């Protein structure tokens, strides 16, 4: 059953009526509701286009967080073959908020790493809602180092509200672990490409997205802080999240103009959660294109390219 966001309530009513008609027809074979159902479907499609044509930043936040949106596990299953998971940071524990391992992408060996939020209550708790602890970032460092030894490109899939801010995480060196992961991304001598598939929250996202090429799905977000957190700090009122979302310029379209990301991946009508297969195939195309752009570059050129990319952030688009 589709979960509707608050701004999709009119759409829910129309699609609900269409489904009721079809249910009646299934119960009574003599009923012919094809024409009425088709009319409702057309009306719903038109409304869906109108709703998603010009989403506000806050509505994009809602879409990026949609519980039915495809997660890292879905992308790995759909886009990669021969996936062999690698666990643990060889220091403390295995953080299930971060998944990663060896795989093939379009028959090319790669290292894939990403945040996994989970898909139901039990798995979300197990994966800590995609909020990594220090051992998760240290696992990523280990896997990127391994990729460097074997000359494997690294693909990262970012989807996190941010690094976990718990007491234990802080005691085990959360900020240092994030910094080490970012440093490892900057000095890896192999191609590194990143896709923000949902939420890109603060340093927890940057630690995986310090890449040669960064792409964002059309309705994903990437920001130094959540709109709710920003509103609580600036206005002492989390209800100001809409204003905060506008000010943060966290949408893929804004960040492309600012030079923070390199490309925006179009999503199916109504968001990635409405057609997961199409969304994941669009991501496949973007990853393939980004890897192709980096083919043939030396380790020195890749490192120089990556460092320049991030040193240049803030040099354009701010006056717009």
From Swiss-Prot:
It comes from the Bacteria. It catalyses: N(6)-carboxybiotinyl-L-lysyl-[protein] + acetyl-CoA = N(6)-biotinyl-L-lysyl-[protein] + malonyl-CoA. The keyword Flavoprotein does not apply. It is found in: Cytoplasm. Its EC number is 2.1.3.15. The keyword Lipid biosynthesis applies. Pathway: Lipid metabolism; malonyl-CoA biosynthesis; malonyl-CoA from acetyl-CoA: step 1/1. One of its GO terms (cellular component) is acetyl-CoA carboxylase complex. Residues 39-293 form the CoA carboxyltransferase C-terminal domain. GO terms for biological process: fatty acid biosynthetic process; malonyl-CoA biosynthetic process. Keywords: ATP-binding, Cytoplasm, Fatty acid biosynthesis, Fatty acid metabolism, Lipid biosynthesis, Lipid metabolism, Nucleotide-binding, Transferase. GO terms for molecular function: acetyl-CoA carboxylase activity; ATP binding; carboxyl- or carbamoyltransferase activity. Acetyl-CoA carboxylase is a heterohexamer composed of biotin carboxyl carrier protein (AccB), biotin carboxylase (AccC) and two subunits each of ACCase subunit alpha (AccA) and ACCase subunit beta (AccD). Belongs to the AccA family. Component of the acetyl coenzyme A carboxylase (ACC) complex. First, biotin carboxylase catalyzes the carboxylation of biotin on its carrier protein (BCCP) and then the CO(2) group is transferred by the carboxyltransferase to acetyl-CoA to form malonyl-CoA. HAMAP family: AcetylCoA_CT_alpha (MF_00823). NCBIfam families: accA (TIGR00513), AccA_sub (NF041504), PRK05724.1 (NF004344). This is Acetyl-coenzyme A carboxylase carboxyl transferase subunit alpha. The lineage of its organism: Bacteria, Pseudomonadati, Pseudomonadota, Alphaproteobacteria, Rhodobacterales.
